[in-house]
Amino acid sequence: MRERAAWAVTAPDDAAESLAFWFDSACRDRDWVRLMEWEALGRVEHAVNGDAERRAAFQQGVGQVRERQARGLLRADVDPGHLLLAMVALTTFPAAFPQFTRLLTGLRPTDQAFVTRHSAFLRRLADGLRPPRQRQAAEARR
């Protein structure tokens, strides 16, 4: 569990690369995604296994987002906790709900074509997470 919570801390600074990194991590560890779903079916309003340690790890992840915002790598006009939650959702949803993925895209989340397309989508979407100056610099590199 500690290793999975470390994703936020070890992710690349660049928003596009960070989303691609998380998506790749979720694709490689579908069992973890399923375990989180199973856990969610329980009584999650109460403490979960390793609650204090996991909360600390997630707060460290929020701190990393806040720090990247302060450095001008991510937009500063969005709440860092909500931004991290959205990033987790964008990168794990296809593995967590493969039926939606297949129904919406015609591909399974395990299909290489889906992985390639979703990674490209996440990179493009991440452009909107960058401050305007960072966005212009990223576009110039393409």
Please place each PLM-identified region on the residue numbering:
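Amphipathic alpha-helical packing segments from all-alpha helical-bundle domains
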Residues: 2-3, 45-71, 81-85, 116-120
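Hydrophobic alpha-helical connector segments
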Residues: 2-34, 53-54, 58-60, 80-84
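Short, flexible helix-adjacent loops and helix caps
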Residues: 2-9, 41, 70-73, 99, ...
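Helical hydrophobic small-molecule/effector-binding pocket
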Residues: 3, 16-38, 45-48, 91-99, ...
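A short, mixed-charge helix-start or loop-turn motif at secondary-structure junctions
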Residues: 4, 43-47, 107-111
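C-terminal peripheral helix-coil segments that are non-catalytic and often amphipathic
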Residues: 28, 59, 63-71, 89-142
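A general secondary-structure junction signal
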Residues: 39-40, 82
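Short beta-strand "wing" residues that participate in macromolecule-binding interfaces
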Residues: 76
